[in-house]
């Protein structure tokens, strides 16, 4: 039995999230269906670095699976690329030690959120970015982001449905890239992220950019440890990308 690590990308707009769910199309289900077919009907399960919600995309999701087939990693990659749908891509496949674990072995992740700042709605980017036709002061967003860097209890910045007992996470950096006059990309790097955390952080920073909240408001929300104390809404899923997963 050999363990394989794969880096995959996918367009999340056609999936009901990553994780297998009854009677819905998911990323995990499509990949496991292809692997099961390759193994002549024997069920093969995959493990990912984490789940993504409906409409959320991935540029660098990491999965692992075990196989007893006597084929190379390169042939696995080519076969899976052919056997999975057009909205999933296998960027790399490689053999890894048996103790590699896509989920429990992570030491950091990067998410990016894409904001289209056009006055007129662009129908061609509707599934891949948030349309935000309002004025934004990027300098205010950068100031606000500094209050979020470091180790904090992010209870105020995650969904009440978060299953983790500890809400303490470390944000290494928040960077802002203005790719052109119309596109703003916010990149979040940290040791881990809670359910809806990046989308709530994005909504908070957008509010800061409009002057609705101040850096002090963010500090108070962190200390409150209560999602209800934060007025910012959760940004919609279509602008969010799991960009990279890091391992030791």
Swiss-Prot record:
Pfam families per the UniProt record, alphabetical: PseudoU_synth_1
The entry's family comment says: Belongs to the tRNA pseudouridine synthase TruA family.
Origin species? Listeria monocytogenes serotype 4a (strain HCC23)
As recorded in UniProt, coiled-coil segments are none
Q: Does the keyword Endoplasmic reticulum apply?
A: no
GO MF annotation, one: RNA binding
Q: Does the keyword tRNA processing apply?
A: yes
Q: Which residues are responsible for catalysis?
A: 53
What is the name attached to this protein's record? tRNA pseudouridine synthase A
Q: How does it assemble?
A: Homodimer.
Q: Which principal EC class is assigned to this enzyme?
A: isomerase
Describe the reaction catalysed, as an equation.
uridine(38/39/40) in tRNA = pseudouridine(38/39/40) in tRNA
**Could you tell me what this protein does?**
Formation of pseudouridine at positions 38, 39 and 40 in the anticodon stem and loop of transfer RNAs.
User: Which residues bind substrate per the record?
Assistant: 111
Provide the alphabetized UniProt keywords. Answer: Isomerase, tRNA processing
Q: Superkingdom, according to UniProt? A: Bacteria
Q: What is its EC number?
A: 5.4.99.12
**Gene Ontology BP terms:** tRNA pseudouridine synthesis
């Amino acid at each position: 039995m050999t363990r394989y690590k794969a880096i995959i990308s996918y367009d999340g707009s056609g999936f009901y999230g990553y994780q297998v769910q009854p009677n819905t199309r998911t990323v995990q289900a499509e990949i496991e269906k292809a692997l099961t077919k390759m193994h002549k009907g024997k069920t093969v399960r995959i493990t990912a670095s984490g789940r993504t919600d409906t409409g959320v995309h991935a540029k660098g999701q990491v999965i692992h699976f075990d196989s007893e087939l006597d084929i190379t990693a390169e042939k696995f990659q080519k076969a899976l690329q052919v056997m999975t749908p057009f909205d999933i891509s296998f960027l790399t496949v490689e053999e890894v030690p048996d103790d590699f674990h896509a989920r429990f072995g992570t030491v950091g992740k990067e998410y990016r959120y894409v904001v289209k700042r056009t006055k007129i709605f662009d129908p061609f980017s509707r599934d891949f970015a948030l349309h935000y036709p309002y004025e934004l002061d990027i300098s205010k967003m950068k100031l606000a982001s500094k209050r979020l860097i470091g180790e904090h209890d992010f209870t105020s910045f995650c969904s009440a449905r978060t299953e983790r007992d500890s809400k303490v996470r470390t944000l290494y950096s928040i960077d802002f890239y203005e790719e052109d006059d119309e596109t703003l990309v916010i990149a979040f790097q940290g040791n881990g992220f809670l359910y809806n955390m990046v989308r709530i952080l994005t909504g908070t920073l957008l509010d800061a950019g409009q002057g609705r909240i101040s850096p002090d408001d963010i500090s108070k929300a962190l200390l409150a440890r209560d999602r209800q104390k934060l007025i910012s809404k959760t940004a919609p899923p279509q602008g969010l990308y799991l960009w990279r997963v890091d391992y030791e």
